[in-house]
Amino acid sequence: MRLEKPMKGAWHAAARTAAITIALAAPLAAQVTPGARLLVPAPGNDPIPMGTTRGEHATRLVIRNATFISGRGTPGTNRAMPPEGPVDIVVENGRIADVVLLDPVNMRSARGADVRPKGDREIDATGMYVIPGLVEMHAHLPGGRRSALGARGHEYAFRLYLGHGVTIVRDAGSDAGIEFLREQRRLSNAGEIVAPRLVLCQRWPLPLRTWNEGNTPEKARLMVQKFKELGADCIKISKSPGHYPDVMAAAAAEGKRLGMHTMVDLKVSESDARTASNAGVRSIEHFYGFPEAGLDGSQSFPPDYNYWDEKDRFRWAGRLWQEGNRHPERIEALLDLLVKNGTNWDPTMAAYEDNRDLFRGRTLPFRETLFHPSYVDVLPDSTTHGSYHSDWKLSDELSWKEFYRIWMGYVKLFHDKGGLLTAGSDVGEAGGIFLVRELELMQEAGLHPLDVIKIATTNATEVLGMKEHCGIRVGCVADLAIVNGNPLDNFKVMYGRGYGFYGILPRGEREKHGGVRWTIKEGTVYDAQALLREAEWYVQQERQAATRAAGSH
């Protein structure tokens, strides 16, 4: 093939065009508007007293040079939108007001016009990714005088959440009580405290040790009405009699009438996931009720099994998926039913991970700095829920490894069928950190990181009925996390204080890499890493207090 030699003038024109394109393809300078304030992280890396960091309010905030992941997708599918950028994102009055494209094609079409938006507060997000604020769908918030996390445990927890980009937390029942958390919700909504937005599910039955409250459909409706009067946003069915099928259906129906959705922890009960979905429950937690669909009869419990002995409960739970998976077609039919009914599955895989690798949980790098001492120092204790590893064997871990393999396969299958997945950690002592871990486990299950971000953001707000929290789109509430790195390439960048690079980079260098740099809640900007430094300070104070108390005995 003979190539025509271009005319000299045409060649120069082509060269000029190529030069312009190459120049525009390079990162654009963060052109700060004269008179605007460029927000920069707090200096230093040491812990700082809790209460030091405040939210930054702006009339018009511009996030410059960002790549964003919208968290949105095609309606009726689980297909998520890919990254877009570079862009300038404009936030006004707590809403996303504009997204200005700065890619070479669009900048060339601007023909030199000043297209860069201006603001009174600006963030240089060059090299960073902006995602919608994460939603923790299964928390147990601390608070009140009985909190194991200390008198300011709720403030500490709020900082762990915001420090990891979590802007909405659904509480699934707390020892702090609805009255205490209702006030925290009010203060958070008013912007008077540093906290994520709170969605409060009242746990039922309450107290948990009694079964004579709400044990008929009529009593259940009255109890739900009482929850509404107390200020609950939703209902958490945790044990019997809420597990009685007729009672569950009555509670879910009354909740729906009052604008309250129902979440349920089925445990091993009269109701399974099929019963709960057909009863109108909005959200099914954990794994209970799913593998049972594949059983021919009862699970093969030993004669001396006792469900309320937690070591028995979780030792034999580790064999449940293996038994249920003998009839995968039955479990697949169950998943089809949930998809048809629009029932959400919130699997909380992070909550059980110690069961498959106990040493992993005991050697996490942030245990000494971000975990409260009451969580780190606890030994197996039969009087404490979840503290049952006193005689945990390799055989138990191997059972749970296989359990996870099968469980994750069905989580992936549910998603592939169009099912509504969300992300919750169920680890109230270290919120935020374990939500990131939950998202890693979803990727281990085979989900694409884009899908995982959608699951943890707009899927969750769909379940919660928060239509205005609709991801990154003009008009949506500006709940955002600005990440110092690309979570699609390495989700470890979501861990705060550089812990995603533990053992790879020196301590003094880790903090410069990864982590959520800024968390934005309805337009209010928080220095995420500074909030985690406050959490570190609180852990230090609590550890010193515990040491003093031990020395006085």
What are these regions (language model features)?
Residues 15-29:
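Bacterial N-terminal signal peptides
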Residues 42-59, 68, 72-131:
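Histidine-rich, glycine-flanked metal-binding segment
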Residues 2-19:
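Bacterial N-terminal signal peptides that target proteins for export
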Residues 112-120, 125-190, 215-218, 271-278, ...:
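Metal-associated gating/positioning segment near the N- to mid-region
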Residues 157-178, 195-206, 228-243, 252, ...:
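Divalent metal-dependent hydrolysis catalytic cores, especially in the metallo-beta-lactamase
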Residues 223-237, 290-445, 541-542, 547-553:
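Active-site neighborhoods of metal-dependent hydrolases
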Residues 477-536:
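C-terminal cap of metal-dependent C-N hydrolases
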Residues 66-68, 391-392, 399, 404, ...:
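C-terminal helical cap
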